[in-house]
């Protein structure tokens, strides 16, 4: 979430040679996990998938106010797999990747709440491809 706020607050952020404020294009938002996959389950039974979806919806609203077209890959607690699928997780990931390839967004943000055994590990993580 901090990364998203940072990107939204910068007028000169560079992305593929253009500033995101010039483009005002499509941004896909992937709220990690969902359906049968809860992700990390925290103290008190809070599920990562629920936190991710809430953050994704808030981020979509903020992006739309800035003039972007924000599309949620997952809009509710359902996974992206068929009920009869033998490997739901694989099908879910394949459908997420297919949507990204088909839509060709300006940016895709995948939201997760990672957990580590080492309590000293904290803060945001950002993964990206370097072209």
Can you name each region flagged by the protein language model?
Residues 1-8:
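Hydrophobic membrane-insertion alpha-helices, especially the h-region
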Residues 11-27, 33-131:
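Catalytic-core regions of hydrolytic enzymes
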């Amino acid at each position: 979430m901090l990364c998203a706020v940072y990107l939204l607050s910068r007028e000169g952020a560079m992305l593929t040679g253009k500033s995101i404020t010039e483009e005002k294009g499509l941004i896909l938002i992937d709220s990690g996990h969902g359906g049968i996959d809860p992700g990390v389950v925290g103290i008190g039974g809070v599920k990562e998938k629920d936190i991710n979806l809430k953050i994704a919806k808030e981020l979509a609203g903020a992006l739309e106010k800035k003039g972007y077209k924000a599309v949620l890959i997952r809009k509710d607690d359902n996974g992206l797999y068929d009920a009869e699928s033998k490997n739901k997780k694989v099908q879910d990931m394949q459908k997420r990747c297919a949507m990204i390839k088909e839509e060709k967004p300006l940016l895709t943000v995948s939201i997760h709440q990672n957990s580590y055994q080492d309590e000293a590990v904290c803060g945001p993580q950002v993964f990206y491809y370097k072209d």
